[in-house]
Amino acid sequence: MSKKGKKYIEAFSKVDKSKFYSIEDAISLLKEIKFVKFDETIDISVNLNLKKNHTVRDTIVLPNQFMKPKRILVFAKGDRADEARAFGATYVGDDDLINKIKSGWDEFDIVVATPDMMKDVGRLGPILGKRGLMPNPKTQTVTNNLKDAINSLKKGRTEFRANKNGVISFSFGKSSMDNEKIKENYEEFIKEVVKKRPSDLKGTFIDSIYISSTMGPSIRVEFVWR
């Protein structure tokens, strides 16, 4: 058995799988059982009770940011392009950027487009769609309000969505952060998820919540806002 494997098993043994931990206790336990030297990301997995026709998808700006600044690419022309540059977009262009991306360039993290550009940007569907970067009005990345879009993205606005199995996976902190700040991010995220409850859903919406660190075991968190 590898040294890493032994440490994981030791950490795993400290988690009571039959217990529902408070978020405060769960965060403390994650830090207690940490066995790697790097600054781990803290993730959440929310299992939802959804029907096949239900979609849960939105964006959120957490109160306490922890991720590296993202490179924002904006497809726009004329005055809109000038606005995007003024508001701090990393890359701004139209056909030039479309052709560059077609050639294999991928040094960007978020894509925003003005509505008039979407017909042309649509040609990049197979490329951007594969990376989950296709601009979409639902994620506020197709807009003429570039100031608000870019500012919120620079503040860390991030998309979350439930997969086909009704599970939302999302990163909401780093192990180096203060426990209270991790908790604040958790509470803000759960609040936003609860808002997305389908209007026709009967019964429980959130089935279970687990948090984990990059290398650590998952910990089940109690949920009291059903």
UniProtKB/Swiss-Prot annotation:
CDD domains on file: Ribosomal_L1 (cd00403)
UniProt xrefs under Pfam families: Ribosomal_L1
Keywords from the named record: Repressor, Ribonucleoprotein, Ribosomal protein, RNA-binding, rRNA-binding, Translation regulation, tRNA-binding
UniProt KW NAD keyword: no
GO-annotated cellular components: large ribosomal subunit
SUPFAM superfamilies in UniProt: Ribosomal protein L1
Keyword hit for Nuclease: no
Swiss-Prot/TrEMBL GO biological process terms: regulation of translation; translation
One of the record's GO molecular function terms: tRNA binding
Subunit comment: Part of the 50S ribosomal subunit.
Entry function: Binds directly to 23S rRNA. The L1 stalk is quite mobile in the ribosome, and is involved in E site tRNA release. Protein L1 is also a translational repressor protein, it controls the translation of the L11 operon by binding to its mRNA.
Family membership noted in the UniProt record: Belongs to the universal ribosomal protein uL1 family.
Protein's name according to its UniProt entry: Large ribosomal subunit protein uL1
Organism: Borreliella afzelii (strain PKo) (Borrelia afzelii)
Lineage per the UniProt record: Bacteria, Pseudomonadati, Spirochaetota, Spirochaetia, Spirochaetales
Gene name per UniProt: rplA
